């Protein structure tokens, strides 16, 4: 998300992907940053209708990156999700002096917490100790809708994950994209991918904000 770093990457011919930390959620912001990058990771808070509207504007207005090609949309498809608004969380920086916007998030939100009333110090009854830790994102069951919305690059969690996790998740989503392109994406295949994805580490799954 550093303009100087993006400019330098452009000068040496390095492809740039705009991070979700930029919180790009509308066409005007995208048009500004398109001069630096060929791929944009839109804000995680967008639903597929909003993503599709941005995609339509990319095509309509011919919004292109440094390579002269239409800028491609990248979206999170699987894995851990931040509990905060994209690019706006400073919890890790405040507590550990490690900035999430510099790729150094210490995931303070994943820890277990007890909640106390500030005045009385009475502990509140909270169902789950992990009060800031959301479930993991899984989109393979509506991958076809993401493709239809204009998503062309799928972002899979890999940081701090073991090789088996990375291999299996990548394999499943690669098969799903191939099935979509070949016209063979169906519920039977989705059920198989779902079962395989549940074998590796997860915190339970949800659809993110995509389906509204």
Report residues per predicted region.
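Surface-exposed amphipathic alpha-helical tracts and adjacent flexible/coil segments at the periphery
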Residues: 15-17, 31-34, 39-212
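N-terminal active-site wall of soluble small-molecule enzyme domains
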Residues: 1-32
